Each structure stands twice: as structure tokens, then as C-alpha cells.
Amino acid sequence: MISLRKTHPLLKIINHSFIDLPAPSNISAWWNFGSLLGMCLMIQILTGLFLAMHYTSDTLTAFSSVAHICRDVNYGWLLRNLHANGASMFFMCLFLHVGRGIYYGSYLYKETWNIGVILLLTVMATAFVGYVLPWGQMSFWGATVITNLLSTIPYIGTTLAEWIWGGFAVDKATLTRFFAFHFILPFIITALAMVHLLFLHETGSNNPSGINPDSDKIPFHPYYTIKDALGLMLLFLVLLLLALFSPDMLGDPDNFSPANPLNTPPHIKPEWYFLFAYAILRSIPNKLGGVLALLASIMILLILPLLHTANQRSMMFRPISQTLFWILTADLITLTWIGGQPVEQPFIIIGQLASVLYFLLILVLMPLAGMLENYMLKPKW
């Protein structure tokens, strides 16, 4: 008799996706991040749902409702700490997942990659509107600064900014709609993640060598389910260590003060996972130019398949490209550091150099390295 999981219409989909899925035999721990991201999303939706039961999206009560959750709700402090630090874990996994895709040439699965970039943008939007909800000083001023960037769009910019605000500044209407967006977006992310998987399963997973692995596949279960379980346990361990021992380490002290439109914090900065893009935005001394650079810093991922010049897919056997990749990684860490510093010398010039290097590496140096490696691999006799 054929197993129910192979015949039942619903179980059949799960079976083809997570049980009998043929997977390359050599995929490393870098391929764990997909399942870790799925887990992060589930944690965020669950903790977020329980937080939403006690939160009020009104400028007068939002801040005190968050304090109420932490003081009076059973394990409310834990829910809040898991949700806030879960976002940090989510972005850590996202950045590592994207980095893996760049290193091993996974972007050549164009549909999967493009959906992935859309997912990244959607998660960033969700995190931004979510950061506004506690209605602390940094929440309010972060929302003011970032939504103000819309006003740089010629002709319709100011109208668009006021339309998003629901008034002439960030206020009650803005907070209410941001809560609505923050509630709906994770479900859109879930749907997009399913589409992401759908396109991935059309081609099958890439692998570290970048060579077609069809001749050597193994079933996903039990081999990769057990491997993913180890990754999930480590993720849980790090998240719990963060949420229980230093829950405010990655937050901003200014957010412990209620929002005050009459008092601007000395350094307005977003959460750590946006700092690299914020540094690129600030490094251009022109508002519109900065916004375009900010958009380009993420949108550049969409053209990576067009910039691939190497004959080999993966960087595993391409030392020049590897070197440039790790320089790019160091550059992004530098940008993250600069984004959290005040706008003064020497941080301004370091940020500008790091921003130029970021685009130079992706648009010029890495494609040239691919061509050079092709030339070096050609027989010379």
C-alpha cells in the first residue's frame, strides 16, 4: 500500500517539499539558513500575535501599553524580548543567507533570487514599521527621518509623504496605519516564502561546488531534517541567551523615553541591521542622491545575474573573487559601524570611501575578476 503522504493532496505537497525532496549530498551548513529563516518568521508571528493582544496603537497609550506588557502581562517581558531580539536574529540569518547566495552563485536561479530580493525588501519594510510601534524617541524620530525621504521624489514627493503620514507630520494616524502594516506584512512574507520555495524546487538546490548535482542526490529526510534541527537548536540557544541575559544590547537607550516631537535626539539612527544602508544614504551630501544610493544598495542585488562573468558558478575555486567577496564583507561591516557614528570627521570620509568601494566591488571589480579567472584557466599551449 502506498504511504498516505504520497497520495493525500495536501500531504503530497509537504512530502515533495520536505521529506522525499532530492537534495545534493554535499550541501554545507550554509544551506541551513532557509529553515532558520522559516523558524524566525514563525517565532516573530507567534510572539507578535500575543504582543498585539495587549498593545494599543494610539499615540497617548502606545508607550505605556508596551510598559504594561513588560510589567503586568504574564511573561510579557519574555514575549517582547524574544520579538525584539528575534528581529535581530532574523536579519543576521538573512544577511548570511544572501552572502551564501552571492558566494556560491545561487543568484543564477533568477526567479528564486528575485523573489528573495523582494522578500528582503518586505522584511526590511516590516522591521521599519515595527520599530515605530513602541513610540519611544528613536521610534518617532526614525519614522520622521525615513518617511521624510519620500519628499525627495520630484513633483509628488511632499504629497506622498503627507499621504503616508495621514497628516502634516508623523502622528496618531501614522502609528495606527503602521500597526496595520506590521500586522499584515508577515503573512505576505509567508506567502512570498512559499513562492520562493516553489521556484527553488523547480531547479533544485545549488551546492558548494556549483556543479550540477543531479547524479548524486539524497532524500531531504532524514539527512537534512536532522541537520536543520541542529541549526535550529543553535539559533534558539543564541536567541535565548540574547533575550534572557542582555535583551537591550542591540536596542537604543533613547527608545526608553516616550516620543517627544519637541525634543530631537542627538544621534538619530535606525536598528543595527539598517545601519549599512543608512551610512550609504548619509555619505552623499544631497537628499535625492542619498535616497537613490540607498535604493541602489539593495536593488543592486537584482542585477547580480547580469554581472556574472565567470565560467564557474561558485567562488569555491576562484581565489581572486573570494578575496573581493571578503573585502565586500569587511566593507559592509565598516558601513554598519559608520552608520552608528555621529556625522563628523573622520567618519564622514570613511563612510564615503566605504560607499564608493561597495558599488565599485559589485559593479566593476568582481565582474573583472571573473573575466581574469576565465583567462587564467585557459590552456596556454
UniProtKB/Swiss-Prot annotation:
It comes from Myoictis wallacei. Keywords: Electron transport, Heme, Iron, Membrane, Metal-binding, Mitochondrion, Mitochondrion inner membrane, Respiratory chain, Transmembrane, Transmembrane helix, Transport, Ubiquinone. It is found in: Mitochondrion inner membrane. GO terms for molecular function: metal ion binding; ubiquinol-cytochrome-c reductase activity. Binds 2 heme b groups non-covalently. Belongs to the cytochrome b family. Disulfide bonds: none annotated. Heme 1 (or BL or b562) is low-potential and absorbs at about 562 nm, and heme 2 (or BH or b566) is high-potential and absorbs at about 566 nm. The keyword Ion transport does not apply. A ubiquinone binds at residue 201. The cytochrome bc1 complex contains 11 subunits: 3 respiratory subunits (MT-CYB, CYC1 and UQCRFS1), 2 core proteins (UQCRC1 and UQCRC2) and 6 low-molecular weight proteins (UQCRH/QCR6, UQCRB/QCR7, UQCRQ/QCR8, UQCR10/QCR9, UQCR11/QCR10 and a cleavage product of UQCRFS1). This cytochrome bc1 complex then forms a dimer. It is a multi-pass membrane protein. Heme b b562 binds at residues 83, 182. This is Cytochrome b. Its cofactor is heme b. The chain crosses the membrane at residues 33-53, 77-98, 113-133, 178-198, 226-246, 288-308, 320-340, 347-367. Component of the ubiquinol-cytochrome c reductase complex (complex III or cytochrome b-c1 complex) that is part of the mitochondrial respiratory chain. The b-c1 complex mediates electron transfer from ubiquinol to cytochrome c. Contributes to the generation of a proton gradient across the mitochondrial membrane that is then used for ATP synthesis. One of its GO terms (biological process) is mitochondrial electron transport, ubiquinol to cytochrome c. SUPFAM superfamilies: a domain/subunit of cytochrome bc1 complex (Ubiquinol-cytochrome c reductase), Transmembrane di-heme cytochromes. One of its GO terms (cellular component) is mitochondrial inner membrane. The keyword Mitochondrion applies. It comes from the Eukaryota. Heme b b566 binds at residues 97, 196.
